[in-house]
Amino acid sequence: VVRLPRSGALHVRRELPAHFSLRRSAQLTYAIENRSPRTLRAGLVEAPLRTLDLGEEELVTLLPARSEVDASLAALPVARGSDTFTRIYVWYESALGLVRRRFVIDAPQAFRVYPDLSAVERYGSLHVRNRLVEAGLRRMRLRGIGSEFESVRDYTSGDAFRAIDWKATARRGKLMVVQREVERSQDVMLLLDCGRLMTARIGAQRKLDYAVTAGLSLASIASLASDRVGVVAFARRILVARAPRSTAASVRALADVLCDVEPHFEESDYARAFAYLRSHLHRRSLIAFFTDVIDPVAQSAVLAELGTLAKRHAVLCIFMNDAVVSGALARTPHSVDESFGLSVALGLSAERHTAARTLQRSGVIVLDVPAERLSIAAVDEYLRIKSRALL
């Protein structure tokens, strides 16, 4: 007769990574201790989770007598937000596999899946670092065509004609330009549309997921420039509201707040959101508005408000276009279905261009890029706005 030790002879401890990032593979580590005098073969599987895809395979390992073995399981975060591990289903058997015993471990463990900022971190270490360091951020300054005089230097190719200091040029006999310091400690407000239009998926992620990631990416770079960053997320009502604040801790707080923001299957109340901004933003600010206004009803509501808002603030309206639509526009149709798809794509494209032109005529800066490039494009546009003193 083959006898197995009691379930108490097997002890399992789960260890989580420091944090989970959306769509970035992570490893769950398990310390599995065999307290029995026999070699055992064991396996475990986690209870299903909303935010993590753990695959369909069990974690299986061989446990020598009175030993502890570390094993890992791949996890792919598929949704943002808070979640909790609940139970671990464990089995173990003799080395020959003749007898198997099963038991369940209650192991509640809370965790959160954050937006993936790895792209902007890589970008920040290269492009942004170059852009900002060249602009003087080594001395914690952003140089450009701001309003504060800093110095006079030799003219170099690419300098604006209006930056030439003609008096200094006459004195020194060569072209000289005024170097001005771009203003710091300015306000940046992220405005996130969390209504019906942002529930649609582009690839594996929802539009709001892309918007949240891009917003936090912009906030991270703005903190390098010592700008204050706040956020308003809204659907039919205001979901999240944080006044602009400075320091890196504020960016971490924004990440915590936006981690759990979800899109709502309802029409967004744009008038309410813009009214909130008008009553709470008392100084000129950059408003980075993440939305996807493509239907005529939503467009009219937004356009009625944005023109007025743009008279007092710098408004950046950020759309994300779908690669499927772009692909349909680029292909020559060879069937009725493809022709129908092209017709739909042309209609969507025309609506987007109409909305963009109308917004631009109202003084709004419009950014319309593929969702996969949203974070980098938003950061680039922020840097352009700062360097040209548009804020």
Residue ranges and their predicted role:
Residues 1-249, 284-289, 297-300, 304-308, ...:
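An amphipathic, basic-hydrophobic helix/alpha-beta surface used to engage anionic
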Residues 1-4, 29, 46, 122-124, ...:
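Von Willebrand factor type A / integrin I
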Residues 163-164, 258-262, 287-291, 340-341:
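Short, basic, glycine/proline-bearing loop/turn elements
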Residues 225, 261, 283-284, 312, ...:
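Structured helix-beta-strand junction loops
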Residues 234-237, 275, 375:
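A glycine-rich phosphate-binding loop feature that marks nucleotide/adenosyl-phosphate handling sites
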Residues 242-256, 374-375:
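Short, electropositive alpha-helical surface patch
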Residues 249-286:
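Von Willebrand factor
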Residues 294:
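Catalytic metal-binding/acid-base residues of hydrolase active sites
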